[in-house]
Amino acid sequence: MWQKPSLTKSMMNEVSSNSPKSPTLTSSPSTQSFANRVLPGRNLDGGGGGSNRLIFGGSGGGSGGGSLPSSPVSSPVNPFNLNGGGGGKSSRRRGVTVAAGSEQVETRRKILLGNSRPFRRRARSMEILNSWDFIPYQKKPSDDEQGQVDQYIQGENDEDLTSYESYITNNNTTTTTNTNNSNNNNSNNDGSGSGSGAGGSFIGTTTSAKTTSTTSTSAATTTTTTTTSSSSSSPSSSSPSSTSPTIASNNDNNNKIEPPQPSKIANSVPPLTLSQSQTQQQQQQKVKPPPPSPRFSTNSSGSQSPPVPPRSSKSLGLSNDFSISLSSSMSSNSLLISGSINTLPTSSSSSSSVGGSGASAASASISSSSSLSSSSLSVSKLIYENNEENKFVVVSGPKDQLVEYLCNKNKLDFSFVNSFILSFRYFIEPEELFNHLMVKYETKVQTTSSIKVSKQFEEIQDRIRQNILIIISVWVDCNYSDFEDNLSLHKRLFKLVQDTPHAVFLRDSIDRQKVSKIPILDLYEKLKDELLLSLSPRGSLSGSGGISNNNNGSDLKNSNNGNNSSNNNNSSSNSSSSSSSSDIKNIKNSFFSLTTMMDWLMNHLSIGYATADSILKKLFKLKVIGSLGSGGGFTNISSSHTNSNSKSSKEELYFFTSTKSIINKEIYSRSFMDYSPQDIAKQLTLIEFKLFQSVKMKELYHKSWTISKSKFENSPNIMSLITMSNKIANWVATEVVTTPHPKKRVEVLKRFISVAEHCKKINNFNTLMEVISGLSNSAVSRLKETWKSLPTRYVNSFNSLQNFLKTDENWKSYRQTLKTKETPCLPYLGLFLQDINFIEDGNSNLSSENDWVNFKKMNLLTSVFTEIQYFQRHPYFSFSTHQNIQTYFEKDIVILPEKELYAFSKFIESPSNPLFRLSKSKNQSIFNI
């Protein structure tokens, strides 16, 4: 309530007379300042200046004067009575409770819930803040915005500023700012202000004028940034303006930056100044923390250098990624990509890069294709899932981050590398991928001011280059057709091999692709003939390192001419064409050193040592080459290598197990009944496996074999194998229904069932499916009399083979057998094509939400592609070619259309067929007897 001045004065006198021991109320300047804000224009001493708002005792509690109707209730809290009582002699004694009336309760509730604010004296050490004072917050720029602030952190520590100031002091750098030191005499300017700079802000507070640096934190790199403030801003439009703390350059004090001290605020706020004591300067000089990595570095003239670019990718954030803070002296045309240095393309780049002219054009095509190397990504967007083996696998992500993850500096994820190489054509072209790999490979490490940092950069780049060579090696092993079909890529690949002498494994991968399609036994025959023909008929020692055993081994000598044998290989090959076969017959046997055979293979096939070694190991496994070991016979080639490498006194000698040329004594026949079932199964295996091995991965992409207009162009090998399979199945049915005599027809059935049994034994499931399909043809299965005449053993065998190839439960029996992966094996290609069809139809290449690559589909496709390639790498080395049988299948087999097959089937078991009537009458006569 509001009282008149005279009434207030009389009340104060009465209180002071009744309470002589109570202290006299005096208003301090700070209290008066508070009173001016809460009770404007009123004094606390009650004298002059108008009436004050008071809460005092009424009728229920003591002798206080009469109250106005607006506030008739006594209050124990009187802002003018420091004793806290109602005042007067008749005040209630302590501990006595007096019931209050209903009116008093209601009015007291209004007072307690109203705007009345009782005065409580503050401690003298605590400064009184304005009602609009607030705790300042410092703005923190995120990596995405590179300086634009969207987060806030509370400015509590000034250690970063101190360390950065000492770094600038030690490097003799000065920071100049445009200081706005407008002195504001208004007492309401004691709030905090924030000044915005180019890359950060300084925020000053009234309690502690602290200046904190802007800290930019990434997934693995923390960069401390400090900038200056050039203008002041108020926290809100209604708040009074305040002066921001500034850092002034002082050339007289050795360009040292002095941090601001907290200013004491009483009734008015003086301008904020920067001062630092001598002891603080000495302590600052003693402590020299490691220099941070400023985003902006300033010099004495105030000009700013370009900011260091951030990392272009954080796609390796989940794979123990680390990075090194870049120093301010690093050139601005380099990027730290997942811990590696990636040089941006400049106009002065030389054309002597790996890959020749094609590689020089690669840097120009990167920016136009997808700009993979220069894409700036702040957060990893790769999505992972747990697979069946409880391992994390990539299931989705942007194309550029998938490529970055492929060639990172860490240990390679070979499952991801294999999946990527086998399926990258779904979202990227081969040239684009090779260009990106070459850009990463050719990146040169920029020199920095720190030797330690430069060494770390070199180690990172060496790991990246090593990983890229491994990736290209996997690419050659899995998809060499990408280089064979593209002449420019093929040239760049061989240029890379020539310019990288330490890339031995990449060279071996190319050599394996050269030799993979050469029949091993044909190669053996050529090796044997040329080495034997290089010897004279009398068995003397030749330049090729061979030794004759015509004198029962008495002339066996150590051959030390292995190094010179390569010079005579051309002459020996020329002499082999003019020599007669009688020369080979005259030679009983000869012994050759390991070096001699290795040199012949390396020079004749233009391959490396490792590939030649693998060929000899296969020949030893086939037991077509023997060794004079300790116990005679065959020895392991690895032990021979150790002996040859250690340069032992006597090098191991090898011999060919068969020196006579294979002469086929069988006469060519146009009837398959003249050939054994085992030979037919083997020759069909060789014919079809050659087609299966020729299937390229690109023929399986995008279901190209199902497009009627282009299937023979895009998938020629798949269509050749499909055509061959249909041809064999129709040939089986044709041979059965075109055999008129019932007994011969039963023999034909028995022969085909035997061929199917041999196909299963040698793991030729593709030919097995063809034979069973031909026997299950409706034109054959309807021959009831023929099947009745078939012996029980063959009937049971046929039923067993049919159950093995049943499609029930998704080919359960066949898939379980295929999982054992016994090699060599020719799988049924139709099931692989069916699986690819289901995966393609049920999954999209890109996710519908954000157009990211659906890498889960790529993993599913890779599981099929990997299985196909596994069986392609294990051919039937032990099978020799039977030219008569292969000629029969190429030229002399007869195939009838479906209509004619059914017509023959109806005729051979109809009464109109005299042979059928004759055989039936004989059977009836035998039955009657």
UniProtKB/Swiss-Prot annotation:
InterPro entries: Ras-like_GEF (IPR008937), Ras-like_Gua-exchang_fac_N (IPR000651), Ras_GEF_dom_sf (IPR023578), RASGEF_cat_dom (IPR001895), RASGEF_cat_dom_sf (IPR036964). Promotes the exchange of Ras-bound GDP by GTP. Residues 390-528 form the N-terminal Ras-GEF domain. Residues 1-15, 247-256, 295-305 have a biased composition (Polar residues). Residues 44-67, 192-202 have a biased composition (Gly residues). It comes from Dictyostelium discoideum. GO terms for cellular component: cytosol; plasma membrane. Keywords: Guanine-nucleotide releasing factor. One of its GO terms (biological process) is regulation of adenylate cyclase-activating G protein-coupled receptor signaling pathway. GO terms for molecular function: guanyl-nucleotide exchange factor activity. PANTHER family: GUANINE NUCLEOTIDE EXCHANGE FACTOR, RAS GUANINE NUCLEOTIDE EXCHANGE FACTOR M. Residues 16-33, 68-80, 169-191, 203-246, 270-287 have a biased composition (Low complexity). This is Ras guanine nucleotide exchange factor M. Gene3D superfamilies: Ras guanine-nucleotide exchange factors catalytic domain, Son of sevenless (SoS) protein Chain: S domain 1.
